[in-house]
């Protein structure tokens, strides 16, 4: 296929798609140019079904530093593992694409997005999402799209689609919404305490804008789209399924209704093992035993799936016996740990998170050097999910995509209420350790983070709580669930996380397993989430009503002084010599910004005070008319040099020592002698002249003797 180009304008910027010129061996490939951002997307599918019990979809978002005219950092000067932002963008694209494949589809699919040029005012992630959907849609991969996504901002009561950098900085909302022509299927958002009504309107505005992008994709697919390949879907043997359902469905139904998680897991596992043992013995000599046992496992999973959903939709019974809108038992604790700067332990049913606060000087901020201009990140929220939290063994190592994503969600939820840098000049790190998990651990980490911040004396604007909402839908009837647990998440259709204060929402995240959800479901879920959020805030505020007025004794204290910008080099010294000497002497940490704000950090107030004295002395300037208690440091024939303070010396000319004539300076002064002097002049080069006699009353002139005349 020769190169074909398709052009439109979206949100005030040119959107150009090129097909047929590059990556022609992939199943589908596109080059998307949005503004001056260029993204190459290639989609590839394996020829055979994978052996696992899940859909092996991999979406990558690769940031090439040349796209922004930069050299990669580090010794190797080559791109390494994806940045946090790249990982989050890959997740952002994966989530709306994944539900658009058929149930039982098991061929491996890879969608690789490579950023070739970068324009900070034209969203490369949104271009990559568009390109991912289009590459799949024009390929022979059986993808039931297209989908598209947009960013939505909110400034002065107006919604803005795909805002530029300046607009996003002024926006009260940073929302990404994706979906198909029919419905929304992915949401990711941070917001400055906006109401449910505004958030819902933003979602609908975003979905409305998506229609234009989907129509553009459909236009392109009509011209260059390939016929979809016939692939084998994972299907179980119908006779085998009927046999197992008839024999064991009643036992599995009973096991599913055991309310306690571990007991329920044991009961369902016992039924499954019994069934597997029977059929493995029955078909032991069959050459297709492996396929049969795979089908047995899949049938049992489908039976459990169907029963959990039936109980909720028909009988309104949840696995643990709760009502549809009921939250699990809550508990909140502060000061769980000694010595740390703040800690909070939050428990919701069998989900428990410990959050630990660390405060540090601003010099500890994380430097983010990606495609965008380098910036410093003051607030970090890290989320850890050890396997013991679900009673299992597993891999331990670097944080995976899920942990990075959950950490970022908590970060968005909490950073909206943090004090400004001027109010609280600290770098802030929260680490959430999930100690138990039965669903909604990311929201528990937000609640625990609120507790840790307030316990640590961080003056947040308001406490934040989070809740996860679920959905069970049969296409006609639906049930929205409050505070979903693991089984409801696993077998449900939606995981809709909502975090916020009493004033409004600070973060949203939605993932679904069906093609999309309606505005009515969104509205109902937001309303139930608000009610639940207020219940959780009641528990948090009963434990700690407001941030403590003081930091923990172990936290670094801070004092800030202002110096003239031209004195910064004096404090730092040649090659950092002066500031290093101060730090070595006092044991403090010092940060100096470009405006002359000097921040001094230490857990020892005396060390801070001593540092302030030293710096004040370094930047102090002599002033004409001021009197100083000085020390003679050098004697010359023409006068004496005296030290006024620190490194500031002055010349006391021989004529300024006394009102009477001084013949030899050394007859009057000696090195090391303390004298009081008054500054009488500072020249344009900063040289200081001082006087001793100016502090001594001038003696009266001697009277003239009368002449005698004979």
From Swiss-Prot:
Its biological purpose: Involved in mRNA degradation. Catalyzes the phosphorolysis of single-stranded polyribonucleotides processively in the 3'- to 5'-direction.
Region annotation Disordered: where it falls in the sequence: 691-710
Major localization class: cytoplasm
InterPro entries: ExoRNase_PH_dom1, ExoRNase_PH_dom2, ExoRNase_PH_dom2_sf, KH_dom, KH_dom_type_1, KH_dom_type_1_sf, NA-bd_OB-fold, PNPase
GO molecular function annotations of the record: 3'-5'-RNA exonuclease activity; magnesium ion binding; polyribonucleotide nucleotidyltransferase activity; RNA binding
Annotated keywords: Cytoplasm, Magnesium, Metal-binding, Nucleotidyltransferase, RNA-binding, Transferase
EC number: 2.7.7.8
Organism (species): Streptococcus pyogenes serotype M49 (strain NZ131)
Identification of the protein by name: Polyribonucleotide nucleotidyltransferase
Gene it is expressed from: pnp
Cellular component aspect of the GO annotation: cytosol
Binding-site positions, Mg(2+): 489, 495
Location in or out of the cell: Cytoplasm
Family: Belongs to the polyribonucleotide nucleotidyltransferase family.
């Amino acid at each position: 296929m020769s190169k074909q180009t398709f052009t439109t304008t979206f949100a005030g910027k040119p959107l150009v798609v090129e097909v047929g010129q590059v990556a022609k061996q992939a199943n589908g490939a596109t080059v998307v140019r949005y503004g001056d951002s260029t993204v190459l997307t290639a989609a590839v599918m394996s020829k055979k079904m994978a052996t696992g019990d899940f859909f092996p979809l991999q979406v990558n978002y690769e940031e090439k530093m040349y796209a922004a005219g930069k050299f990669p950092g580090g010794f190797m000067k080559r791109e390494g593992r994806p940045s946090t932002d790249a990982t989050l963008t890959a997740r952002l694209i994966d989530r709306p694409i994944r539900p658009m494949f058929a149930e039982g589809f098991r061929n491996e699919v890879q969608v690789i997005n490579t950023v070739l040029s970068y324009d900070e005012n034209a969203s490369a992630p949104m271009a990559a999402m568009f390109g991912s959907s289009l590459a799949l849609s024009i390929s022979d991969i059986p993808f039931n799209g297209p989908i598209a996504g947009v960013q939505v901002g909110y400034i002065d009561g107006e919604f803005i689609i795909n805002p530029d950098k300046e607009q996003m900085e002024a926006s009260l909302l940073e929302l990404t919404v994706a979906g198909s022509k029919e419905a929304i299927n992915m949401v990711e958002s941070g917001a400055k305490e906006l109401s449910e009504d505004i958030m819902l309107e933003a979602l609908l505005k975003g979905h409305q804008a998506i229609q234009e992008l989907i129509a553009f994709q459909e236009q392109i697919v009509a011209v260059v789209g390939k016929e979809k390949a016939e692939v084998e879907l994972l299907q179980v043997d119908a006779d085998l399924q009927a046999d197992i359902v008839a024999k064991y469905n009643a036992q599995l139904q009973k096991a599913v209704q055991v309310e306690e998680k571990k007991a329920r897991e044991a009961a369902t596992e016992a039924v499954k093992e019994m069934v597997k043992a029977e059929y493995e013995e029955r078909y032991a000599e069959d050459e297709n035993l492996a396929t049969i046992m795979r089908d047995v496992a899949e049938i049992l999973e489908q039976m459990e799936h169907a029963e959990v959903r039936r109980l909720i939709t028909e009988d309104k019974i949840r696995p643990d016996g709760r009502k549809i809108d009921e939250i699990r038992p809550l508990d909140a604790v502060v000061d769980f740990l000694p010595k740390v700067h703040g800690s909070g332990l939050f428990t919701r049913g069998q989900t428990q998170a410990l959050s630990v606060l660390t405060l540090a000087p601003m010099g500890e901020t994380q430097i983010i050097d990606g495609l965008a201009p380098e910036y410093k990140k003051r607030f970090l929220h890290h989320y850890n999910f050890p396997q013991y939290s679900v009673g299992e063994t597993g891999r331990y190592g670097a944080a995976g995509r899920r942990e990075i994503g959950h950490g970022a969600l908590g970060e968005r939820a909490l950073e909206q209420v943090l004090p400004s840098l001027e109010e609280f000049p600290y770098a802030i790190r929260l680490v959430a350790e999930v100690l138990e998990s039965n669903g909604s651990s990311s929201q528990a980490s937000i609640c625990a983070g609120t507790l840790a911040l307030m316990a640590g004396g961080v003056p947040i604007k308001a406490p934040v709580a989070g809740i996860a909402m679920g959905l069970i839908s049969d296409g006609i009837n639906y049930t929205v669930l409050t505070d979903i647990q693991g089984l409801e998440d696993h077998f449900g259709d939606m995981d809709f996380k909502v975090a916020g204060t009493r004033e409004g929402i600070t973060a949203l995240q939605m993932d679904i397993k069906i093609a999309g959800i309606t505005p009515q479901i969104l509205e109902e879920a937001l309303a139930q989430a608000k009610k639940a959020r207020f219940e959780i805030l009641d528990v948090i505020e009963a434990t700690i009503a407001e941030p403590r007025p003081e930091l923990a004794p172990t936290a670094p204290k801070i004092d800030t002084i202002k110096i003239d910008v031209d004195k910064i080099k004096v404090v730092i010294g040649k090659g950092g010599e002066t500031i290093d000497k101060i730090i070595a002497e006092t044991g403090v940490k010092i940060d100096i910004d470009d405006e002359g704000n000097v921040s001094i950090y230490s857990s020892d107030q005396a060390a801070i005070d001593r540092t302030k004295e030293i710096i004040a002395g370094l930047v102090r300037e002599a002033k004409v008319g001021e009197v100083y208690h000085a020390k003679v440091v050098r004697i010359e024939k023409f006068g004496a040099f005296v030290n006024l303070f620190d490194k500031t010396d002055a010349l006391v000319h021989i004529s300024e020592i006394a009102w009477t004539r001084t013949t030899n300076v050394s007859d009057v002064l000696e090195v090391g002698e303390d004298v009081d002097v008054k500054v009488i002049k500072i020249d344009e080069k900063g040289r200081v002249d001082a006087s001793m006699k100016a502090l001594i009353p001038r003696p009266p002139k001697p009277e003239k003797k009368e002449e005698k005349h004979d």
